[in-house]
Amino acid sequence: MLPKAAWSLVLRKGGRGRRGMHSSEGTARGGGKTPRYTNCYAQRHYPMPEEPFCTELNAEQQALKEKEKGSWTLLTHAEKVALYRLQFNETFAEMNRRSNEWKTVMGYVFFFFGFAALVIWWQRVYMFPPKPITLTDEWKAKQLQRMLDMKVNPVQGLASRWDYEKKQWKK
Amino acid sequence: MAPEVLPKPQMRGLLARRLRFHMVTGFVLSLGVAALYKVGVADKRKKAYADFYRNYDAMKDFEEMRKAGIFQSVK
């Protein structure tokens, strides 16, 4: 199977990302535009998308794009920021911001743990058959007594914890 | 944003720094874990076995088991 990194690339790039790589069909489309999927914006693992963020430019922005074709030292700081914003949706700092989503996720996880526990409890009370004979308390007591008689694991294990003189567990 | 000048970030040697940190840390942690294992598990176990067998009487042990009735060949 594909390695995990390849799968995440396949899933996350969305339709536009994959097709946009090969074809002139993007530019040949002309008037129509493929709908922008939410995951086509830049992400940490996909920092340079093919399409710029703003494709419809007003006159002022068009002029700026023309100026960009010349020497970049002539651009003012504000113009550079404006060009960045045309190209990208968010800065790296904005894109990488933390969120509180994990709390919601953990909440749902624990809720469903609890729900599953209630379901299993109900099943235990109303559905489970009687225990096999080897799991009843009397049988387990006799089994333990036999293991102690045999001195199972006398060095560091079970029989080493039993006090044979006082007939009780060692403190 | 106000045009304050941020200090220039570290531009070079980033991989080297990361490698150095992780190699040192890995080395120290590995040695530490190995030492703790030797003392806490291996030596402790050797001592437990030595103490057990120092005054061990196999026949006495056998008699106790026989009296408890677990054998099929001797009663």
Swiss-Prot record, chain B:
Domain of life: Eukaryota
Organism whose genome encodes this protein: Macaca silenus
Mitochondrial intermembrane side, ranges: 55-75
UniProt main location, coarse: mitochondrion
InterPro entries in the cross-refs: Cytochrome_c_oxidase_VIc, Cytochrome_c_oxidase_VIc/VIIs, Cytochrome_c_oxidase_VIc_sf
Record keywords: Membrane, Mitochondrion, Mitochondrion inner membrane, Transmembrane, Transmembrane helix
Function: Component of the cytochrome c oxidase, the last enzyme in the mitochondrial electron transport chain which drives oxidative phosphorylation. The respiratory chain contains 3 multisubunit complexes succinate dehydrogenase (complex II, CII), ubiquinol-cytochrome c oxidoreductase (cytochrome b-c1 complex, complex III, CIII) and cytochrome c oxidase (complex IV, CIV), that cooperate to transfer electrons derived from NADH and succinate to molecular oxygen, creating an electrochemical gradient over the inner membrane that drives transmembrane transport and the ATP synthase.
Any one of the GO CC terms: mitochondrial inner membrane
Spans through the membrane: 14-54
Pfam families with a match to the protein in the record: COX6C (PF02937)
GO biological process: oxidative phosphorylation
Assembly description: Component of the cytochrome c oxidase (complex IV, CIV), a multisubunit enzyme composed of 14 subunits. The complex is composed of a catalytic core of 3 subunits MT-CO1, MT-CO2 and MT-CO3, encoded in the mitochondrial DNA, and 11 supernumerary subunits COX4I, COX5A, COX5B, COX6A, COX6B, COX6C, COX7A, COX7B, COX7C, COX8 and NDUFA4, which are encoded in the nuclear genome.
This protein's name: Cytochrome c oxidase subunit 6C
Membrane topology type: Single-pass membrane protein
Membership in a protein family: Belongs to the cytochrome c oxidase subunit 6c family.
